[in-house]
């Protein structure tokens, strides 16, 4: 097979034209201040065990089917432990698969969307390629870890996940700053769920108060496929903006949830866009936002019913834990046929003093009562998750609830 080595050039041309194009939402960032950096020496991951475990990464990998590690722009390892599962760096995948990868590159995310997609194509490095072959059910989760430690650095990997027909996999992506530093993370993730396939995608972020976070994610779900996504962020950060776009074909289903806890002067603009493209597709967008200090978050949720017999629901809840923080929720429902069912509910408020006093009257200290209420607020029922993933999410949520009070 003849490999066209120049097929990426058209994307680079588009990217060069939008290097000054701001995002539609969120705080604008001067991308010229950040450059990719190589690490001076490879650190021992065991030294960062607590940090890695807090974002869902298992250092020993006993209950993992494969793993990918990247620090700054440097790929540390990409390993598959199970037949039917391929894990490579994106550069290795391009070299190995050549023209085949063109069908999955900048398809669900457009390279000229904004300056962050552009910089990922022009200056980005690394990223994982995960492919689950037709008919394979991957027993344990796959984990991907993206870490940053260098000051004024840019980390902009391009990740591609392909779950072929009748396959199933769970992916845990943990992203974190290894120390206090100024940086920009602008990862691109494209996910393709084949016919009758299922992908569970869990992303956990823990950054710091000087980081700008700009993930760009696009998902395409084939006929009768299932995509489940849960995003967790518990951190201070300078700013965050992300709006994953999920497209469902006939009979496909999606469950998109997020739990975001902000503190300090953090600014976030977060949400999902769900497009019910073909008949009998359905999905939910569930968000839980908690703010402390002077933090602010805008939570967006858009569902477009673009075919008959589709169903969608939005549930946005916000909890203000300080008088100076702010939560703004913006649900949008767009029905283009008369036989669709699109609904939403939204609420923003503070902890109920009545409920706190009720728990105190039953023997709980005030901090314990508040912790129980916060834990209950953060709980989301995610359908069909493997038991191991459920336990990990529950454990992470409990740790977050304890750290808030």
Regions found by a protein language model. Name each.
Residues 1-110, 116-119:
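Long, low-complexity, mixed-charge
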Residues 4-5, 97, 105-364, 380, ...:
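Conserved beta-strand/loop scaffold segments within soluble protein domains that form the structured core
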């Amino acid at each position: 097979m003849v490999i066209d080595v120049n097929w990426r050039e058209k994307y680079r041309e588009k990217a060069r034209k939008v290097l000054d194009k701001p995002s539609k939402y969120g705080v604008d960032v001067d991308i010229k201040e950040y450059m990719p950096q190589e690490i001076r020496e490879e650190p021992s991951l065991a030294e960062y065990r607590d940090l890695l475990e807090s974002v869902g990464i298992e250092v020993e990998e006993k209950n993992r089917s494969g793993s990918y590690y990247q620090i700054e722009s440097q790929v540390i390892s990409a390993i598959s432990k199970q037949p039917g599962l391929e894990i490579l760096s994106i550069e290795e995948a391009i070299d190995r698969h050549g023209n085949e990868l063109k069908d999955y590159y900048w398809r669900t995310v457009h390279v000229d969307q904004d300056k962050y997609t552009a910089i990922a194509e022009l200056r980005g490095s690394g990223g994982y390629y995960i492919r689950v072959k037709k008919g394979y059910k991957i027993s344990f989760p796959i984990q991907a870890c993206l870490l940053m430690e260098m000051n004024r650095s840019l980390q902009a990997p391009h990740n591609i996940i392909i779950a072929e027909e009748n396959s199933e996999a769970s992916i845990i992506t943990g992203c974190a700053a290894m120390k206090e530093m100024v940086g920009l993370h602008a990862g691109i993730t494209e996910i393709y769920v084949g016919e009758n396939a299922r992908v569970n995608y869990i992303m956990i972020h823990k950054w710091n108060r000087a980081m700008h976070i700009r993930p760009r994610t696009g998902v395409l779900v084939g006929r009768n496929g299932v995509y489940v996504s849960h995003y967790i962020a518990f951190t201070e950060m300078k700013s965050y903006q992300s709006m994953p776009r999920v497209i469902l074909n006939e009979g496909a289903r999606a469950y998109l949830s997020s739990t975001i806890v902000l503190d300090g002067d953090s600014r976030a603009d977060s949400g999902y866009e769900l497009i019910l493209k073909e008949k009998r597709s359905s999905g939910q967008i569930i968000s839980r936002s908690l703010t402390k200090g002077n933090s602010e978050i805008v939570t967006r949720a858009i569902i477009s019913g673009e075919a008959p017999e589709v169903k969608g629901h939005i549930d946005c809840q916000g909890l203000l834990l300080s008088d100076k923080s702010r939560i703004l929720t913006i649900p949008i429902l767009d029905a283009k046929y008369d036989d669709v069912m699109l609904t939403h509910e939204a609420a923003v408020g503070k902890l109920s003093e009545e409920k706190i006093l009720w728990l105190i009257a039953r023997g709980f200290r005030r901090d314990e009562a508040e912790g129980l209420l916060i834990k209950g607020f953060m709980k989301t029922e995610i359908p069909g998750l493997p038991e191991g993933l459920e336990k990990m999410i529950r454990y992470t949520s409990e740790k977050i609830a304890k750290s808030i009070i």
